């Protein structure tokens, strides 16, 4: 049975992220780990790439979770990569059509249904995260030199 027929029968597509298989579930707006279904990656937590056709996020390979860069990150994570995956139309054009009440074939001319995809991985040293961490380290040093800034920055 071909992939499109399987999809129309309800079999969800999968994507490989750093060697981990994830089920694409656009109804729930998430990628669900095939081996550990409680490990989910929410599409809402991902950033749209500049081209508007992909999502970007930092992925912790060990914990199988999205890694959020924040102002308190002062060390570079050891088991993480920058991940790029297609947007919803690239991941599951049939699922997108169903989400909006359209026919299953609606998006297929521009977005053919394909075999499970594989995420593009970029090492952290080429991701911009090291520079972000260095900037956070500098801010931390400034805060340590002026204790009032720590109180001001941490207050709600």
Model-derived segments and their meaning:
Residues 72-73:
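OB-fold/S1-family single-stranded nucleic acid-binding modules
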Residues 16-34, 56-63, 69, 79, ...:
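Extracellular/lumenal glycan-associated surfaces
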Residues 95, 103-128:
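A positional "C-terminalness" feature that preferentially activates on distal terminal regions of long
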Residues 24, 133, 148-156:
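Non-Sec secretion/translocation targeting segments of pathogen effectors
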Residues 1-17, 31, 37-67, 85:
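Short, flexible domain-boundary/linker segments around small modular repeats
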Residues 88, 116-132, 140-149:
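Eukaryotic compositionally biased low-complexity/IDR segments
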